[in-house]
């Protein structure tokens, strides 16, 4: 039985040898043929030469190097494109997702699950801000989007070959892999685990990238941000109508003069702000449509030297 590990890497020269040694020395994985697909996402350090050297000595190591930095989501998709295992497991090279969890994932898969999610029961290794923003994102996404995604589940999971082949059929270029992996469905099971500290290096995923990923997730799987502006427009129009009616009554019935520029200026600024926000939301969706219509490849792989 063949198990494929999909491992995106970006400037991870310190972590790769530790990860490789840990996988190959882990006794519970030795009964399986374990393929390791490294995806070098445009690293500037020795990452490329390290994974190429591993591939020379180990035929089950598949080294892929992008022509530039395309991002983690395209790297994950590239890994899925190039795996050959009966089951596929995306995993981070920093070993925050412990190798010891993999046999439990395999056990659930062999029991009949198409996808086995690895759920973090303890996120104390993440900062408080990251934990809270992740919690808010999951709640918002699952309230307005379909399908829902399991809270505290990252990319670390096991997928059957059938699930992987279904994912590869999807044509979109703007990728939110957590949503895509949930969208394909199938019989799903969950394994809980405790996330550990990184074995080496530092995280390359900063707050700005997380923010953009959250936007990608919401706009890829929900039209609610567009629909909500219809309701806002109706609300503002209703308030304006009622205020206008009150001004007429106040002037004709009570004889009060119409208030001048201050109220008008406030109204103009308020409506201008609302319109700009609405245009911004609309622009997010139009921008994604524009990128999709170009039909550019998700990634480019350079040949090995």
UniProtKB/Swiss-Prot annotation:
<dbReference type="GO" id="GO:0016757">
    <property type="term" value="F:glycosyltransferase activity"/>
</dbReference>
<comment type="similarity">
    <text>Belongs to the glycosyltransferase 2 family. GtrB subfamily.</text>
</comment>
<feature type="transmembrane region" description="Helical">
    <location>
        <begin position="229"/>
        <end position="249"/>
    </location>
</feature>
<dbReference type="InterPro" id="IPR029044">
    <property type="entry name" value="Nucleotide-diphossugar_trans"/>
</dbReference>
<dbReference type="Pfam" id="PF00535">
    <property type="entry name" value="Glycos_transf_2"/>
</dbReference>
<keyword id="KW-0812">Transmembrane</keyword>
<dbReference type="GO" id="GO:0033644">
    <property type="term" value="C:host cell membrane"/>
</dbReference>
<keyword id="KW-0472">Membrane</keyword>
<protein>
    <recommendedName>
        <fullName>Bactoprenol glucosyl transferase</fullName>
        <ecNumber>2.4.1.-</ecNumber>
    </recommendedName>
</protein>
<dbReference type="GO" id="GO:0005886">
    <property type="term" value="C:plasma membrane"/>
</dbReference>
<keyword id="KW-0328">Glycosyltransferase</keyword>
<feature type="transmembrane region" description="Helical">
    <location>
        <begin position="263"/>
        <end position="283"/>
    </location>
</feature>
<dbReference type="InterPro" id="IPR050256">
    <property type="entry name" value="Glycosyltransferase_2"/>
</dbReference>
<dbReference type="InterPro" id="IPR001173">
    <property type="entry name" value="Glyco_trans_2-like"/>
</dbReference>
<keyword id="KW-1043">Host membrane</keyword>
<comment type="function">
    <text>Involved in O antigen modification. Catalyzes the transfer of the glucose residue from UDP-glucose to a lipid carrier.</text>
</comment>
<keyword id="KW-0808">Transferase</keyword>
<keyword id="KW-1133">Transmembrane helix</keyword>
